[in-house]
Curated annotation (Swiss-Prot):
<dbReference type="InterPro" id="IPR006261">
    <property type="entry name" value="dGTPase"/>
</dbReference>
<comment type="similarity">
    <text>Belongs to the dGTPase family. Type 2 subfamily.</text>
</comment>
<dbReference type="Pfam" id="PF01966">
    <property type="entry name" value="HD"/>
</dbReference>
<dbReference type="Pfam" id="PF13286">
    <property type="entry name" value="HD_assoc"/>
</dbReference>
<dbReference type="InterPro" id="IPR026875">
    <property type="entry name" value="PHydrolase_assoc_dom"/>
</dbReference>
<protein>
    <recommendedName>
        <fullName>Deoxyguanosinetriphosphate triphosphohydrolase-like protein</fullName>
    </recommendedName>
</protein>
<dbReference type="GO" id="GO:0006203">
    <property type="term" value="P:dGTP catabolic process"/>
</dbReference>
<dbReference type="InterPro" id="IPR006674">
    <property type="entry name" value="HD_domain"/>
</dbReference>
<feature type="domain" description="HD">
    <location>
        <begin position="73"/>
        <end position="215"/>
    </location>
</feature>
<dbReference type="InterPro" id="IPR023023">
    <property type="entry name" value="dNTPase_2"/>
</dbReference>
<dbReference type="InterPro" id="IPR003607">
    <property type="entry name" value="HD/PDEase_dom"/>
</dbReference>
<keyword id="KW-0378">Hydrolase</keyword>
<dbReference type="GO" id="GO:0008832">
    <property type="term" value="F:dGTPase activity"/>
</dbReference>
<dbReference type="InterPro" id="IPR050135">
    <property type="entry name" value="dGTPase-like"/>
</dbReference>
């Protein structure tokens, strides 16, 4: 095999992109692979992990058994990765790294979406709380146990940095939240992720791709559930303009196809806006290296000011009309109750956990036991958590 003829597409990257040839490496040293770049290997390890497969039965707004067509964490992550790759390609960044960060960003989420996380965070409040980004880091650095020489997936510095900081610095004047989860601080002591700096542009692409995909699939799922109607979207600036164009171009289009067309155009409009604004930001900031990106005093991959206002308006509309819809709130409350009850049950009776988990509980402090239960609970799918609840409490609660 002629290694010199293998195409890793290195030549198309900008000077400020991440470069797999000069990666900061992994916590545990590994020899370079002849067929895949370090970031490709990260992506492949993420895809082949147990945590990735579990995303198939984890949801965000709707419960996993309500419909086969609602988004799950898995389909959402794939959609985010597709948008992140598009942005990375347009900006001459490393597509594989952007994809890796996009695919791993939801690993730490609990069953039942944000309702489950809120419940677990409340239960864990006396023990340091629960944060899904910190949990994702625990999964890829400790809880996935597939390799002979290390725990976790031993991902590159760049992927871990992007996972932890894709929403911005965790320390310093630009940090959004002054409280840093202990798991992130403990890992940072082993491998400095530069928590006071902005993440690389690939991570920024993944972060804004998450927003774009989230907004689009909530519009789609909201219409599919009939909790929302196209008429309601006439109240929102961005979707109203898009619907007006669709009506002009396709006046006879049925409601279902009109909804699908709206979602596609919403994604396209936001992606094009991000590319244009990010190009302008790059021209103004003029980074000459990835270090310049890290030291920049701003996020570079952003919406335009106008689109940021539109996006905020759409989010506010979705919160008011979808996330706080009576039926969604009823399911949310049921989901929180399930997670709270499971945590209490496991904490009081660790032996009811599966053998491979309760075998780890001997001689643990209360803090360590709570964290072990959080690891177990947060890894559950919606289906598994519901079955556990029904089994342990001898009930048939099914969110109805």
């Amino acid at each position: 095999m002629d290694k010199s003829k293998i195409n890793f597409n290195y030549q198309s990257r900008a000077v400020y992109s991440a470069n797999p040839q000069t990666s900061r490496g992994r916590l545990f040293h590994e020899t370079m692979n002849t067929l895949r770049s370090p970031f490709q290997r990260d992506r492949d390890r993420i895809i082949h992990s147990n945590a990735f497969r579990r995303l198939k039965h984890k949801t965000q707004v709707f419960i996993a058994d309500e419909s086969d067509h609602y988004r799950t964490r898995l389909t959402h992550s794939i959609e985010v990765s597709q948008i992140a790759r598009t942005l990375a390609r347009a900006l001459y960044l490393d597509e594989d790294l952007a994809e890796s960060i996009a695919l791993v960003h939801d690993f730490g989420h609990t069953p039942f979406g944000h309702a489950g996380e809120d419940a677990l965070n409340e239960a864990m409040a006396p023990y340091g709380g629960f944060d899904h980004n910190a949990q994702a880091l625990r999964i890829v650095t400790k809880l996935e146990q597939r390799y002979a020489n290390f725990d976790g997936l031993n991902l590159t510095w760049e992927t871990l940095e992007g996972l932890v900081k894709h929403n911005g610095p965790l320390l310093g004047p630009y940090a959004k939240n002054k409280d840093i989860p202990i798991d992130i601080l403990q890992y940072n002591a082993k491998q400095d992720l530069q928590l006071n700096c902005f993440a690389g542009l690939e991570a920024q692409c993944a972060a804004i791709a998450d927003d774009i995909a989230y907004n689009a699939h909530d519009v789609d799922d909201g219409l599919r559930s009939q909790f929302l109607t196209l008429d309601q979207f006439e109240q929102v600036s961005l979707t109203a303009a898009l619907l007006n164009d669709i009506k002009k171009e396709h006046p006879q289009l049925d409601q279902t196809r009109r909804g699908y067309t709206l979602v596609r155009r919403q994604i396209k409009t936001m992606v094009e806006d991000v590319i244009k604004q990010s190009q302008e930001n790059l021209a103004r900031v003029k980074p000459k290296s990835i270090s310049d990106v890290h030291q920049a005093e701003q996020t570079i991959v952003t919406f335009s000011p106008t689109m940021a206002v539109y996006e905020r308006e759409l989010k506010d509309f979705l919160f008011k009309n979808l996330y706080y819809h009576d039926q969604v709130l009823n399911r949310r409350n049921a989901a929180k109750r399930i997670v709270q009850k499971l945590f209490e049950c496991y904490y009081e009776n660790p032996d009811v956990m599966p053998e491979n988990w309760h075998n780890k509980t001997a001689h643990l402090t209360n803090q360590e036991l709570a964290r072990l239960i959080a690891d177990f609970l947060s890894g559950m799918t919606d289906h598994y958590a519901l079955r556990e609840y029904q089994h342990l409490f001898d009930c048939t609660d099914n969110f109805i």
